[in-house]
């Protein structure tokens, strides 16, 4: 089960792709935390469509938890974020926290030996970028960013196909001006 597309609301726009699992069930377990932006639904859809197994979640807001359960069914919600960090099943934590908190959450995730998948923008200061860069180098963990307008946007994918097919000539530059 996954969230359906809501084209009228860019903040919760969560397209679904053709499912193309690249892992077996239970082979790649992930969790979701801090559902402050609707892109968490697109992030979750993408991970599920790739074959990932959603094993747990953390979200302080009762309403946001209910919205998530309405889309994905019953899921184990933990009462503290640290429980996700301590769970040995979890290989990656996806998050759409408030932007200025994203890097700090990612640093905690990587320090716990897990990869991190955050919504954009991933940083709000140069110091955050440097801290994450250093943590990636020392931990070996990944800090991935969900650019929905590139990864989950039919127009962007179609443009990519047109470019690949040579239908629009030689492309010198692409600029994406997102709605928010």
List PLM regions with ranges.
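Alpha-helical elements of Rossmann-like donor-binding domains used by nucleotide-donor carbohydrate transfer enzymes
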Residues: 42, 67, 83, 92, ...
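Short, well-ordered coil/turn segments that N-cap beta-strands
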Residues: 27, 52, 75, 91, ...
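N-terminal Rossmann-like dinucleotide-binding module
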Residues: 2-72
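A contiguous active-site-proximal alpha/beta segment in oxidoreductase catalytic domains
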Residues: 123-180
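Histidine-centered active-site/metal-ligand motif
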Residues: 37-39, 102, 115, 180
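Beta-loop-alpha module in the N-terminal Rossmann-like domain of NAD(P)-dependent dehydrogenases
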Residues: 72-135
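Residues embedded in well-ordered beta-strands within globular domains across many folds
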Residues: 58, 94, 172-175
């Amino acid at each position: 089960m996954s969230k359906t597309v809501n084209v009228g609301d860019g903040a919760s726009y969560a397209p679904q792709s053709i499912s193309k699992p690249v892992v077996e069930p239970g082979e790649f377990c992930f969790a979701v935390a801090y559902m402050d932006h609707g892109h968490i639904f697109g992030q979750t859809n993408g991970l599920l469509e790739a074959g990932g197994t959603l094993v747990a979640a953390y979200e302080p807001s009762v309403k946001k938890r209910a919205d998530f359960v309405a889309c994905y069914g019953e899921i184990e919600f933990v009462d503290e974020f640290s429980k996700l960090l301590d769970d040995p099943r979890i290989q990656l934590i996806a998050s759409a926290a408030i932007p200025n908190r994203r890097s700090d959450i990612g640093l905690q995730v990587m320090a716990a030996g897990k990869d991190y998948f955050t919504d954009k923008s991933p940083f709000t200061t140069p110091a955050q970028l440097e801290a994450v860069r250093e943590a990636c180098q020392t931990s070996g963990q990944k800090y991935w960013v969900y650019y929905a307008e590139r990864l989950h946007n039919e127009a962007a994918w179609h443009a990519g196909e047109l470019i690949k097919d040579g239908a629009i000539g030689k492309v010198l530059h692409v600029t994406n001006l997102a709605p928010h």
